[in-house]
Amino acid sequence: MTGTRILELFGPAPEPPSELGRYRILSPTAGIRVSPLQLGALSIGDAWSTDLGSMDKDSAMELLDAYAAAGGNFIDTANAYQNEQSEMWIGEWMASRGNRDKMVIATKFGTDYRAHELGKGLAVNYSGNHKRSLHMSVRDSLQKLRTSWIDILYLHTWDYTTSIPELMDSLHHLVQRGDVLYLGICNTPAWVVSAANTYAQQQGKTQFSVYQGRWNPLRRELERDILPMARHFGMAVTVYDALGSGKFQSRDMLARRKDQGEGLRAIYGGQQTALEEAMSKALGVVAAQHGIESVTAVALAYLLAKAPYVFPIIGGRKIQHLHDNIEALSLRLSQEEIEYLESVGDFDPGFPYDMAGVDPADTGIATPIVAQAAPMAFVQRSKAIGYAESSKGSQMFG
């Protein structure tokens, strides 16, 4: 009996209910294990239903249950989402399910999260990057989430009004106290993050281990400086707007939404642009190559193939959409497929990359200043888990 127990203890875990439960290391500087797709909780709540659609508490609990049942453990929220309902409902869900220790919760500070109750202009120190805002936000998030710690705390947006030493010293204090485990930053220029992490490393403080930003096949600005910066500092990248604000949809999907009385989210505009329609068609072509219909799965697979330590955030309000998105984890996109999707848009890295070139570790091609000296060969950087060396249908992308 004892031997059996020992074998069970050290034996492998069973296969997960879906690929969502095949966990990954968050980043080289954050060893916590997380699901490859993060559940975005922007829609958890009904306070912003006019702009984001309606989701009552029962539906929210069902969505959270479905995500967890599929093996998901990684949830993204913020202090202000849905006028604080998002954090409160997640906290209520974890308390009722008794699963706090199983979940990895990321939340954010920096926005004015109390104006909805106190009034505009009457909650000035509830927002900003400064120590007082941070103190109150973490105090309140812990209470709303019904937890004693936050797994990942993001600075929501850089506001240029707080010094890097004040920010990093204050964040490090929370880590030392055990209120926060890992640090992240969103919507911030690469030079600021670089300066902050350099300060942290030099002063023996906790650095940012994850960056959150906008990225999809039509919005590739993150690749210019933020992605190389994240790689340099050992940071993960969590991605919002991965599905083009919900506009990467086939004509059939849009027709079904219309038949069901649903439109695109009002806050993002009610119609696809010509470029969004073209991208949706291209995503459909790649989906067909893989024998599936879901263009959203391909859009997510694109990000998962681009670089290691990338975690798309999936939002939405329907369980069926969740399962469609999980399909992305079974896809592997080739370089030909990636380039085919990127050919729809127009991304120019600009100066100084048009002069200096890009890292040969990514391309295998020497930069002009290196090539002028001698022929060179380069060790290639590791590819993402979602990357495939070749595609059976690659000839159609030529």
From Swiss-Prot:
Its EC number is 1.1.1.-. GO terms for molecular function: oxidoreductase activity. InterPro entries: AKR_Detox_Biosynth (IPR050523), NADP_OxRdtase_dom (IPR023210), NADP_OxRdtase_dom_sf (IPR036812). One of its GO terms (biological process) is dehydroaustinol biosynthetic process. Signal peptide: none annotated. Pfam families: Aldo_ket_red (PF00248). It is an enzyme of class 1 (oxidoreductase). Disruption phenotype: Impairs the synthesis of austinol and dehydroaustinol and accumulates the intermediate compounds preaustinoid A4, preaustinoid A5 and austinoneol A11. Keywords: NADP, Oxidoreductase. The keyword NADP applies. Substrate binds at H156. NADP(+) binds at residues 76, 186-187, 212, 241-251, 317-325. Gene3D superfamilies: NADP-dependent oxidoreductase domain (3.20.20.100). The keyword Oxidoreductase applies. SUPFAM superfamilies: NAD(P)-linked oxidoreductase (SSF51430). The active site is at Y81 (proton donor). Pathway: Secondary metabolite biosynthesis; terpenoid biosynthesis. Homodimer. Belongs to the aldo/keto reductase family. Aldo/keto reductase 2 subfamily. Aldo-keto reductase; part of the gene cluster B that mediates the biosynthesis of austinol and dehydroaustinol, two fungal meroterpenoids. The first step of the pathway is the synthesis of 3,5-dimethylorsellinic acid by the polyketide synthase ausA. 3,5-dimethylorsellinic acid is then prenylated by the polyprenyl transferase ausN. Further epoxidation by the FAD-dependent monooxygenase ausM and cyclization by the probable terpene cyclase ausL lead to the formation of protoaustinoid A. In A.calidoustus, the austinoid gene cluster lies on a contiguous DNA region, while clusters from E.nidulans and P.brasilianum are split in their respective genomes. Genetic rearrangements provoked variability among the clusters and E.nidulans produces the least number of austionoid derivatives with the end products austinol and dehydroaustinol, while P.brasilianum can produce until acetoxydehydroaustin, and A.calidoustus produces the highest number of identified derivatives. This is Aldo-keto reductase ausK. The gene is ausK.
